[in-house]
Amino acid sequence: MNGINDKSMNNEALIERIVLNRKKALKQKGKKSTEGLEKPVAFWIKRDRLLNEIGKEFTIILRTRGCDWALGKTGGCSMCGYIQDSYKDTVPPENILSQFNFALESKRHEIEHDNNNYILKIFNSGSFFDEREIDKNLRTSLYNIIADIPKIKEVVVESRIEYIDRKKLEEMKTHLKDKYIEIGIGLETVNDYIRNNYINKGISFKEFQEAFELCKEYEVGVKAYLLFKPPFLNETGAIEDCTNSIRTLINMGINSISINPINIQRGSLVEYLWFQKRYRPPWYYSLFTCLKNAVKQEDLENVRILCDPSGAGTKRGIHNCLKKDCNGHMKNILENFVLNQDVRELYNDEFNCSCKLKYKLKNAYL
């Protein structure tokens, strides 16, 4: 036993359960009003790691129709509940542009008068290059606005690989000129079986590699999202899987790796398992073991390692025990590691909580 749950699940049964949970959650949510389409889901500024320095991120979450993978017959990924933030119907491009401008004008003065450089992250709970979410003309309008903001040095968007093509990469590079571009892709793991039978991602590692090589041709970076502790893995399996994924991606020359410990999102299969006490979000101890095993200081000269867990320290997010001091300490160490890109930060764990023994015993006997 390698720590990965040997009980394989029929993919059709997995999809059926994902779709059922999704429909139930969306029905309870009801139809969204058109009144909210002029403003984004959320936007914020906070400290973040840029390629070669500590700066700030300006994140905008746009409300679009949502992820086509989640809206389709497959029901989407087993851990994802972001479809509940979407409109689930076509959002006119002018509304999406208004959302972007609303966020930008709210923060423009702060950005322009800040000494820090910025990374702009545009998320839309789906794929930036999916024409049904964000069409070509809208993308061009966004590029032209961004190009005129000198403080923004890096731009990150997200997309499933089937929407990434030469034309879209060329357009983005042409309009954004000297800004560093990175495309976030939800790979989740380099293991095809786990990705498609436990997560229901619907892509192969080979397809990811092809997308990476295509982006490299256009000098566009790729940020691979890795899921830490997918459903049906225990802590040991999660450590093994993510360690292997990190090493594989580093060796292939990936630009950035963003490790995402699962947080329990509403309407997801993972929430269904969590309610049944068949899933627990990962421990910080497991994440730190993975990072210590997988990342060497010399790796960080060429690869950016990121990790900003949602719901950290709560029952639904990565946590040890639920003591504030314990989780707060681990969170601070993780933040310092990411900001400084220095593995020595991971060993700054002089805080010893009694829950560490409980964690070790659980891992030894489960």
Question: Where do the protein language model's features map onto the residues?
Answer:
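Canonical Radical SAM [4Fe-4S] cluster-binding loop centered on the CxxxCxxC motif
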Residues: L50-S98
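Conserved C-terminal portion of the radical SAM core fold
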Residues: K206-S268, F288-D308
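Well-ordered, non-membrane alpha-helical segments in soluble/globular domains
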Residues: V91-S106, I134-I145, I203-F208, A238-I246, ...
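Acidic (Asp/Glu)-rich catalytic clusters
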Residues: K107-N115, L142-P150, E170-Y180, E213-E219, ...
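Distinct, well-ordered alpha-helical segments
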Residues: R132-T140, D165-T174, T236
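Core AdoMet radical
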Residues: I83-A103, K107-K136, I149-D165, Y180-E207, ...
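Hydrophobic faces of well-ordered beta-strands that scaffold small-molecule active sites
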Residues: K56-I60, Y118-I122, V155-V157, I181-I185, ...
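Auxiliary Fe-S-binding modules of radical SAM enzymes
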Residues: M1-K32, G36-K39, I264-L366
